[in-house]
Amino acid sequence: MWRDKVKEYEDFILEDLKGLLSIESVREDDKASAENPVGPGPRQALDYMYKIAERDGFGTHDVDHIAGRIEAGKGDDVFGILCHVDVVPAGDGWDSDPFNPVVTDDKIIARGTLDDKGPTIAAYYAVKILNEMNVNWKKRIHIIIGTDEESDWKCTERYFQTEEMPELGFAPDAEFPAIHGEKGISTFDVIQNEKADDQDEPEYELRSFVSGQRYNMVPDEAIANVAVKENMTDVIQNFEQYLNEHDVEGESVVDSGVLVLKVQGKAVHGMDPSIGVNAGLYLLNFLATLNLDKTAANFVAFSERYLFESHFGEKMGMKFHTDVMGDVTTNVGIITYDNQDGGKFGINLRYPEGFEFEESLTRFKGEIQSLGFSIELGKNQTPHYVEKDDPFLQSLVQAYRNQTGDDTEPYTIGGGTYARNLDKGVAFGAMFSDSEDLMHQKNEYITKKQLFNATSIYLESLYKLCVEE
């Protein structure tokens, strides 16, 4: 029944999704203002969702242009569908324009198809279809739309300062059948705050280093500018040998007497950095072979001692595992250095229930202080968990099983979704077990089958939970 109903709307779903995907809704702090709190792109995407909602007869409510909601249904209780329309930067290496959606016979290719614009449109259409069926709602539906999920969650932080908190809800921002637990997520900067003096002119001076744009992405590019006193050819040859030995890509060029070294890695979501290739850490690992100026040498040595080839907090003394949520993970998403101010490592650490985060960070902070480094804590979100046998969760899972015939159990993840804003919130789709996970990677896509099947699952689940029989 539900899949047949979705068939009537497939062309409309694709058109509305293409419009949303065409908006480059990446956070841009340098363009932020009161009108565009995290930049013009995310604001434009938020307004786009208001526009299609008003076209379809729904009410909307804006919260300071950084978040808002689409309203449907009726009743005392509120059911929340928590979505986001911001995306991570596209990065390089795409086979097509990431913000000019390509629609083939079986897929839609663009940044945000999986995370989270495709699932957002699927959930929206589930509500739209039910509304156009003139169902007898027993709950109010709030489709809550954020614009800063990929960075600091300023959107939901502001939204829930003044707006009603749903009793139940889901975030269509992960996988089916359902995610009932999410690791704690923290971001912090390790800052080099002591410069060392060189008594003699160094053989190699690190002028600058840059890698990564987001804490929650494994950086796929790193660039270092090195002033070479002598033996330039030897350094270039050693760099090429290093790339071959470590099976990573890169290049070197000489620009105005300065050696520019570049490494290409593999960007993946920061929740599991072990499956990516961190370009920044590999380039620092090569720089460790050079007799650098002392300040740079201390920066590189820090990476070697605590970060390189340590995806699970081992080198920082934070290794921890539970059977329910798995391992601590550490992603070094941002690395910067210049010869005037020193360097910074931007770290995204994810941890399971039972991990003593504050105690561990305090210990690590004390350990690195003597090395000339300090820590600035950004955001820390504690782990989130809903019991697997909760009736609400089971209702969602049953809708999934009815539509797919798959009896896979709900599970926990290292990622973080808006579901953790709710006491009883879970992540629910829109990826399936056979979906290729290209979130935060080049050539991100969603299949039409996945998009329409997710819409059908959302339809059935919302009908069971929010409509009078």
Swiss-Prot record:
Q: Which UniProt keywords apply?
A: Dipeptidase, Hydrolase, Metal-binding, Metalloprotease, Protease, Zinc
Question: Known CDD domains for this protein?
Answer: M20_PepV
Q: Which GO terms describe its biological process?
A: L-arginine biosynthetic process; proteolysis
One Pfam annotation reads Peptidase_M20
Record: residues binding Zn(2+) 1 = 115, 150, 440
Required cofactors, per record? Zn(2+)
In which residues is Zn(2+) 2 bound?
84, 115, 173
The organism sits in which domain of life?
Bacteria
Q: Which Gene3D superfamilies match?
A: 3.30.70.360, Zn peptidases
* Free-text cofactor note: Binds 2 Zn(2+) ions per subunit.
Please give the InterPro entries that the UniProt record associates with this protein: Bact_exopeptidase_dim_dom, M20A_pepV-rel, Peptidase_M20, Peptidase_M20A
Family per similarity comment: Belongs to the peptidase M20A family.
Q: What is this protein called?
A: Putative dipeptidase SSP1012
Q: What species was this sequence derived from?
A: Staphylococcus saprophyticus subsp. saprophyticus (strain ATCC 15305 / DSM 20229 / NCIMB 8711 / NCTC 7292 / S-41)
